[in-house]
Amino acid sequence: SQKNIDTGMGLERLAVVMQDVDSVFDIDTMKAIRDKVCELSGKSYQKDALDDVSIRLITDHIRSATFMISDGIMPSNEGRGYVLRRIIRRAARHGRMLGIGGTFMAKLAATVIDESKDGYPELEEKKDFIFKVLTQEEEKFAKTIDQGLAILEKMEKEMQTAGEKTLSGENAFKLYDTYGFPLDLTQEILEEKGFSIDEDGFKKAMEIQKKKAHDAHKATNYMGADACLLYTSDAAD
C-alpha cells in the first residue's frame, strides 16, 4: 500500500505555497475579503502596522463567523455560541477602530460567500439567514459599545491619576454585567494601553452576582411573587 505523510499544513497554508504568496491573507479567497475591509474602511493594507492588525483580524473573524452560522451555531453566552459572539464583537470593535461606520458584517459575509460558495454551496443557500444573524448581533453590540468604551476610558483616566496599572475586578465586572463587554475584550483594550485586569477579583464579583441571583430566585414563587409576602398573607387570612 502507498504511504502518505500528513504535513498538517491545512488548505490555507497549502494555498500559500501553491500561490507563492507571503501569508494566508494574500491567497485569493482571503485577499478578496481583506480588500473588501479596505474598501469599507478607506484604509490601505500594509501602510500602517496597527491598521493591518485590524484588517487581518476582521478578515479572519468574519470568515469564521460566516461558516459557524452556516453550521447552525448562534450567538449566545455559552459554549460555541459564546465563541461566535466574541469574534463578531471583536471584529465590530476593530471595524470602529478602522473608522467603518454603521453595520458592515453582512457586506463582508457576502464576499466570503462569493469566494467560497463553489466549494460550500450551503453558504449561498443560507446567506440571508447569515446576514440577518450577523446584523442583529452587530446592532445589539452597537447599542452598548459606545457607552462601555466611554466608561472604560473614564476608568483608565482614574487609574492613571491614581498611578495604578490594574483595573479592579469589580469595575471589570461592571463593564461585563452592565455593558456586555466580555472580559477578554476589556483585557485586549487595556493591554493595548499597558494596563491589566484583576481577574481573580472579576471572578469573585461574578460569584457574588450569581449568589444574589440564586438567593433572589429562592425567595420568589414560580410566578415571581415574594414568597415571604405570600406566607404572611396566608397567616393573616
Residue ranges and their predicted role:
Residues 24-27, 77-78, 99, 139, ...:
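Ordered, soluble secondary-structure elements with a strong preference for glycine-centered loop motifs
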Residues 141-225:
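Extended, domain-scale alpha-helical bundle/helix-rich regions
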Residues 1-131, 188:
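Feature marking long nucleic-acid-engaging regions of large polymerase/nuclease enzymes
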